Amino acid sequence: MADLAKIVEDLSALTVLEAAELSKLLEEKWGVSAAAAVAVAAPGGAGAAAPAAEEKDEFDVILTGDGGNKINVIKEVRAITGLGLGEAKALVEGAPKAVKEGASKAEAEELKKKLEAAGATVELK
């Protein structure tokens, strides 16, 4: 145990350049590459993030365009949001804009269907 403590002390005293040189020497001696270990570890981290994305339960309904049916889309936006005519018109003309934020998946899908039926292009985020 005393030998390990001495090694830790010696390694802690190394400068960055000395540590880099030590790393190269160990890679040559053991026939390994430190970069390969990092590359192998990266996919595991990405895989862990994927299930969290699948479990998303709140969505933003984003109006990306009026599809040439501005009047129908404005009417639908007013019905969904309760905005006045001028505010709904500004929202549609300012696309891409959020029509509804934090909606449940079912509500977001329903709003998307209604807006697309009016001629709008919509995406869920």
UniProtKB/Swiss-Prot annotation:
GO cellular component labels: cytosolic large ribosomal subunit
GO biological process, one term: translation
InterPro entries xref list: Ribosomal_bL12, Ribosomal_bL12_C, Ribosomal_bL12_C/ClpS-like, Ribosomal_bL12_oligo, Ribosomal_bL12_oligo_N_sf
Record-linked Pfam families: Ribosomal_L12, Ribosomal_L12_N
Disulfide bonds: none
MF terms in GO: mRNA binding; structural constituent of ribosome
Keyword annotations from UniProtKB, A to Z: Ribonucleoprotein, Ribosomal protein
Top-rank lineage group of the source organism: Bacteria
Assembly and binders: Homodimer. Part of the ribosomal stalk of the 50S ribosomal subunit. Forms a multimeric L10(L12)X complex, where L10 forms an elongated spine to which 2 to 4 L12 dimers bind in a sequential fashion. Binds GTP-bound translation factors.
Family: Belongs to the bacterial ribosomal protein bL12 family.
Purpose of the protein: Forms part of the ribosomal stalk which helps the ribosome interact with GTP-bound translation factors. Is thus essential for accurate translation.
The name this protein goes by in its record: Large ribosomal subunit protein bL12
Species for this entry: Sphingopyxis alaskensis (strain DSM 13593 / LMG 18877 / RB2256)
